[in-house]
A protein has these predicted regions:
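Nucleotide-binding motor/catalytic cores of P-loop/tubulin-like NTPases across gene-expression machines
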Residues: 95-97, 103-140
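C-terminal binding/interaction regions
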Residues: 142, 150-164, 168-169, 175-181
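C-terminal helical cap(s) of enzyme catalytic domains, especially alpha/beta-barrels
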Residues: 26-48, 177-178
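Glycine-rich phosphate-binding active-site loops on the catalytic face of alpha/beta enzymes
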Residues: 9-32
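Long, charged amphipathic helices and adjacent flexible linkers at domain junctions
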Residues: 39-74
Length: 183
């Protein structure tokens, strides 16, 4: 990549973009694999220099609706209690994407039963999408979220996670709960 492309990648990451890709010329050039490796290294180093917890606290987010409020509260709670993860149970992916937009420094696991949602979440900043079976109760939702977050994030005994989602018998857009769980 050229210096300009390196600068563009770093600035895109700093500005909070969820995904980056090579330009056509670079991708079709002589060294596309090396270009991707360099781009990934630039992105990783740039992310390491960002203090996401300070950015979250200092930014004046506009809270327009309930899902914004729950997503913002989930991020704030995770930071405040030093949670090791956020588990989002989502049918449409909306709640996971809303949490992602706040750029929480806490890892996010997006649990979904919908393959289309799983694919979309793969492009959401900080979200690791996981396919799960449908929940038939909030107890199963909490158990699955806790178990999956432990496996995916490598959590240990006494680590805390924040779980959010909704139990609405298969309809999307009804996020209505936040819970803190200890592993």
């Amino acid at each position: 990549p050229t210096r300009a492309e390196i600068s563009d990648v770093a600035n895109a990451v700093y500005d909070g973009t969820s995904a980056i890709m090579l330009s056509g010329e670079t991708a079709a050039g002589k060294y596309p694999v090396k270009a991707v490796e360099v781009m990934a290294k630039i992105a990783e180093r740039t992310e390491q220099s960002i203090h996401y917890d300070k950015r979250f606290r200092n930014f004046d987010f506009q809270i327009r609706n309930e899902i914004d409020a729950i997503s913002h509260a989930t991020c704030g709670m995770a930071i405040d209690i030093k949670a090791k993860g956020i588990a989002v149970c989502t049918l449409s992916g909306m709640t996971a994407r809303m949490i992602s937009r706040f750029r929480s420094p806490v890892d996010i696991v997006g649990l979904t039963t919908n393959e289309k949602t799983w694919r979309k979440l793969a492009l959401s900043w900080g979200v690791t999408p996981i396919m799960v079976e449908e929940f038939d109760s909030t107890e199963v939702l909490f158990y699955t979220a806790k178990k999956t977050a432990k496996e995916v994030l490598g959590l240990e005994k006494d680590d805390r996670i924040v779980i959010t989602g909704g139990y609405t018998n298969g309809t999307s857009g009804n996020t209505n709960l936040i819970k803190v769980e200890r592993i």
